[in-house]
A protein has these predicted regions:
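Start-of-helix register in tetratricopeptide repeats
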Residues: 34, 71, 78, 168-171, ...
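Residue-level recognition of tetratricopeptide repeat
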Residues: 41, 78, 82-85, 121, ...
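Register position in tetratricopeptide repeats
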Residues: 45, 82, 242, 276-277, ...
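TPR-repeat structural position
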Residues: 49-52, 91, 98, 184-185, ...
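Single-residue signature of alpha-solenoid repeat helices
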Residues: 55, 96, 101, 151, ...
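Structural marker of alpha-solenoid helical repeat scaffolds
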Residues: 65, 111, 161-165, 197-198, ...
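Canonical tetratricopeptide repeat
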Residues: 75, 172-175, 207, 235, ...
Length: 516
């Protein structure tokens, strides 16, 4: 090594030795229990479902510190009550947070006097969305409604009193006031007066966005301000359903499902959208998913029956109807759909018993229409005419009912009503034909997925073909009725309409020959 190299090495080494040493950044001290309590309180006011779960978890951990235990326990009670309410509002699987809140309250030596009342309200108040309370679907739901009705005045007064000072009380006051008929005369501003001190909290802003109606702008603003408000997607989907924006609704429900899979109201909502979109296989899959989560979900059972019926799976539909009847909910609907599937299998005696039972529980046009069809197949023509007449009275726009009523009158050789009814039925069926063609044009021009478009168009072409055969039958039977009534010009007019028809042509030509 040369002398120059030695000098260079010495200089370099000396410079390195003189360089300042890197100092590691100081580790911040851990948050104190008081700071952690404040952070958990902030999560409660933030109001999103995940925020509430995080707050509950933090309060639970803080209960191990003796000097923070009471405040942390009260915080855990508050968070548990809010989680329980949110789960019921959203229709999530309820995980016993009301019971946890009651258990925690029993460990505190001094609780606010209003707290037991608020927790009773959390337990009893039905789920609601946009002010619309969900229909009870179990004996437990009915008992909750009874308790709420009996205690409404006492509970509402106590909860309203506490609403200005506590987030749980404020949220429950608004949950009660926004959904019950007893407060319908108050404006929304009046409903929110007791919670004015908490009005800046997103927790309260969420209630403002869902009080009496769902406000898409307010909901979107909440999600923009705090992306953790994932539950907003469900409510936005409900708004889309109300606006008949089914693809947008499906997207919002899919976002909600991606966030929480254990969510039966979302899986059922996806199934309902698929049913309306005529995607029956997808609808069935999500009704089945709903029933995996909630085996006695009666709305999903009824939806499953409909999906199976439209898929032509009669035996499975009947078995599902049996399940629904055993639960003693929607018995009339279950009897109707069971009768419909039994009639498809030509079990007409069983179908008749079911449709007659349905008639005692449902007042609509569909039940007597089905009864008319079943009676016709059982060769009970007078009974059939009676049921079709009732169905037509209840829904004069059902062309098929009108058609069958005319056919039965023709078979009974009651020519005057047969002729007049069948002329009207044929006109009605022609209007249906025109409307289906317009629907096909609309579907073809839409941006729906190609597979869905093809299925919907194919289904309407089947309806058109069926309707045209019914029109041909109506024209021929009208010709027969008019011939027997000596209304020769009308008999000729309607016979000519089917003179070239493969089914009726020869007989129509025979009528025309007799008229010459």
């Amino acid at each position: 090594m040369t002398k120059g190299c030695l000098v260079l090495c010495a200089v370099v080494c000396g410079a390195a030795a003189c360089a300042p040493k890197t100092v590691a950044p100081a580790t911040p001290p851990p948050a104190t229990p008081a700071q952690r309590l404040a952070s958990a309180d902030a999560l409660v006011r933030a109001g999103c479902y995940d925020c509430l779960l995080d707050a509950y978890g933090e309060y639970d951990l803080l209960r191990q510190f003796p000097y923070a235990k009471d405040a942390a326990t009260l915080g855990a009670i508050r968070a548990a009550g809010l989680i329980a309410r949110r789960q019921r509002e959203l229709g999530l699987i309820e995980e016993g947070f009301v019971d946890r809140a009651h258990s925690l309250a029993a460990t505190v030596t001094s609780v606010p006097p209003w707290l037991p009342v608020v927790l009773d309200l959390v337990d009893a108040l039905p789920g609601s969305a946009g002010g619309v309370t969900r229909t009870p679907t179990s004996d437990l739901d009915l008992d909750r409604q009874r308790r709420l009705r009996v205690n409404f005045d006492i509970w509402s007064a106590r909860v309203r009193e506490a609403a200005s000072t506590d987030e749980l009380a404020a949220y429950m006051w608004l949950s009660l006031a926004c959904s019950q008929t007893q407060t319908r005369d108050l404006t929304i501003d009046q409903l929110f007066e007791p919670v004015a001190a908490l009005s800046d909290a997103p927790l309260i802003a969420l209630k403002r966005a869902t009080c009496r109606r769902l406000d898409a702008t307010r909901l979107a603003d909440l999600a923009t301000a705090n992306p953790r408000f994932k539950e907003v997607a469900y409510w936005l989907g409900l708004i889309d359903v109300g606006d008949r924006k089914l693809d947008a609704a499906d997207k919002h429900f899919a976002d909600a499902y991606a966030w929480r899979q254990q969510w039966p109201t979302v899986t059922e909502s996806i199934a309902n959208v698929a049913m309306t979109s005529e995607e029956f296989q997808r609808s069935l899959a999500f009704y089945d998913r709903t029933l995996e989560l909630e085996p006695n979900a009666v709305d999903a059972l009824l939806g499953r029956i409909r999906a199976l019926t439209y898929l032509g799976r009669q035996e499975d539909a009947i078995a599902t109807a049996d399940r629904l009847i055993a639960l003693r909910w929607f018995v009339g609907d279950a009897r109707y759909w069971r009768a419909l599937n039994e009639s498809e299998l030509e079990r007409n005696d069983e179908a008749w018993m079911d449709v007659e039972a349905a008639a005692k529980l449902l007042i609509n046009a569909d039940v007597p229409k089905l009864a008319g069809l079943i009676a016709y197949r059982r060769h009970q023509l007078d009974v059939s005419r009676d049921r079709f007449t009732l169905a037509h009275t209840r829904n004069a726009n059902d062309c098929e009912t009108f058609f069958y009523l005319g056919i039965v009158n023709a078979e009974l050789r009651d020519w005057p009503p047969a002729a007049d009814i069948l002329i009207g039925a044929a006109q009605c069926l022609q209007e249906n034909d025109d409307n289906y063609l317009k629907e096909i044009d609309t579907i073809e021009a839409s941006d729906e997925p190609p597979a869905r478009k093809a299925a919907k168009i194919a289904r309407r072409r089947q309806y058109i073909e069926k309707g045209r055969r019914q029109m041909a039958t109506a024209w021929f039977d009208t010709a027969v009725a008019c011939y027997n009534l000596a209304r020769k010009s009308e008999a000729q007019q309607y016979a000519e309409k089917v003179a070239d028809d493969q089914q009726f042509g020869e007989r129509a030509k025979e009528i025309l020959a007799r008229l010459r």
